[in-house]
């Protein structure tokens, strides 16, 4: 088997894959050429879409991203090619980022950081507590699961929004669907988006949904920037709504320097950095996932995290224990 690794792994992880599949040909190349693509059976990573990936010989594409929307478009891959995403890899890193944003807003850390530059000792007279708060997590895959797991340490009441209602989910007090948002948003102190991109999720948080939220709620997006309408968010912020907005993803990336979103004291923007291969937990999990899936492929077994080309979601969702 010929395996191409173009994922942004470090030398240790790349070497681990090479050593595990010592009897196979493993090519490590961050920027593969069309000639490379034309010769391999498996691609590990997200190859550039300018390359022709629609190849009958390509057995599997093992993405290093949780999202797969660019690769499920008709004609991008051959119908015989299996596609998997990296769900499970990012949850730990992103959940820490979310908690950090929540604490930053609740304890006014951004305000104090700005005051430090001026040598200004001015205690804030407002704040929020995460303890005993009501949290709505929209999109309960691995990232939502890891967020909920950590928030349980704060004794939060957690509502998970999924496509389909399930009787029980780990670390969740209540399970609902998108259709229930109008009822749940007015009750939620924190709303956290960890959605993949699909036709149904684009601008799901428009003016109507944003105004359904508590006026002093905190909104955080670590899923896809397209889930929130920037134009509507700016309008709502100008009306004095929302205590804080944490954005690790936005509609247009990088966010233009001219965007009004940069100017709000109660908005915290990070450059799509909550998850990524800089984090050891991400690299470790993804490397093990890749090894397992190549073994599954060789043994003609079902692949983990296989993507449904119709929905863009995983065919089977499992949660870590």
Predicted regions and their residues:
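Rossmann-like dinucleotide-binding domain for NAD(H)/NADP(H)
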Residues: 216, 222-321
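N-terminal glycine-/charge-rich "phosphate-binding" loop or analogous flexible N-terminal tail
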Residues: 1-41, 321
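Rossmann-like adenosine-cofactor binding region
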Residues: 165-260
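Conserved beta-strand positions in the Rossmann-like core of class I SAM-dependent methyltransferases
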Residues: 159
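Glycine-rich NAD(P)-binding loop of Rossmann-like domains
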Residues: 112-146
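Short loop/helix-cap segments at secondary-structure boundaries that form the rim of catalytic
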Residues: 15-19, 34-38, 51-56, 71-79, ...
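Glycine-rich, N-terminal phosphate-binding loop of Rossmann-like dinucleotide-binding domains
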Residues: 47, 65, 195, 222-223, ...
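Phosphate/diphosphate ligand-binding glycine-rich loop within oxidoreductases
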Residues: 41-116
